[in-house]
Regions:
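Key DNA-contact positions within bacterial/archaeal DNA-binding proteins
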Residues: 80
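Hydrophobic alpha-helical connector segments
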Residues: 91, 95-98, 106-138, 188-195
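Solvent-exposed, amphipathic alpha-helical segments
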Residues: 49, 53-60, 107-111, 140, ...
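A short His-aromatic
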Residues: 83-86, 90
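Hydrophobic/aromatic-rich alpha-helical bundle segments in the mid-to-C-terminal region
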Residues: 154-159, 176-241
Length: 241
């Protein structure tokens, strides 16, 4: 009888000890998870600030002047915070360009959504692309593309990002052309890419003098060629009733 009582007492003690340990462990895990979430949120905010600062530096000061020191000063963070998110300057620039490209795509998609239908979107493609090229992120991307001509590490870091973004752009243009009723969808995807490349070049030509008349005439010619392309693919534009 005494032995049974001792067994029961030992069992109750062990069960209480196990429950206490489990409760403490659960509370510790909960605190750890909350701390990790706070750390993650802070890290994400720091990363966002750094990317925004890098894009602004690229746009306003150029690639050569976009150093880690310049970015950390503009973002208002410590050098350690920068290096924790981006261990090298190349990683910082590549991260900023990836974000800039995504912002440019979002800008284009938002402008396209404002238009009434797929045909209107396709016909407006040249003007929408031109607007997108002129936003600060467009200038930052152009600056990095020029720098990648001689910076092999930057070119290597940007290559997979550019390939992914370009594939998304091509898919968007194919979907727009298909929805508009175009038969030769691939020709439209190529046309869209030609527009982007041409308009990016025009932004370069206008960087040091926005009033160059001949360059603006060239831009008008690009727009006129796009109208001809749309008439070939979609027929004449319908007059608004």
């Amino acid at each position: 009888m005494l032995t049974i009582w001792r067994v029961r007492l030992t069992f109750r003690f062990c069960r209480g000890l196990i429950l206490s340990v489990m409760q403490n462990r659960t509370e510790t895990i909960g605190r750890d998870v909350s701390a990790r979430r706070r750390t993650t949120r802070r890290g994400e905010e720091t990363r966002r600030q750094l990317i925004q600062a890098a894009v602004e530096c690229l746009c306003e000061r150029g690639y050569a002047a976009t150093s880690i020191e310049a970015v950390m000063e503009r973002a208002g963070v410590s050098r350690g915070s920068v290096l924790h998110q981006f261990p090298t300057r190349t990683a910082l620039i590549a991260g900023a360009i990836e974000a800039a490209m995504e912002i440019m795509m979002a800008h284009t998609r938002e402008r396209m959504r404002d238009l009434p239908d797929a045909e209107a979107r396709y016909r407006a493609m040249c003007d929408v692309f031109w607007e997108t090229q002129k936003i600060p992120e467009g200038a930052a991307v152009t600056e990095a593309l020029l720098a990648s001509r001689w910076d092999e590490a930057l070119a290597e870091a940007m290559r997979p990002v550019a390939m992914r973004v370009e594939a998304e752009i091509d898919d968007d243009m194919r979907a727009t052309a298909l929805a508009a009723g175009v038969k030769d969808v691939e020709a439209c995807a190529v046309h869209a890419r030609v527009l982007i490349l041409t308009l990016r070049g025009i932004t370069l030509e206008l960087m040091y003098d926005k009033g160059r008349a001949m360059i603006h005439r060239a831009l008008d010619q690009v727009r006129a060629q796009h109208v001809v392309h749309c008439e070939e693919m979609l027929g004449p534009a319908k007059n608004p009733s």
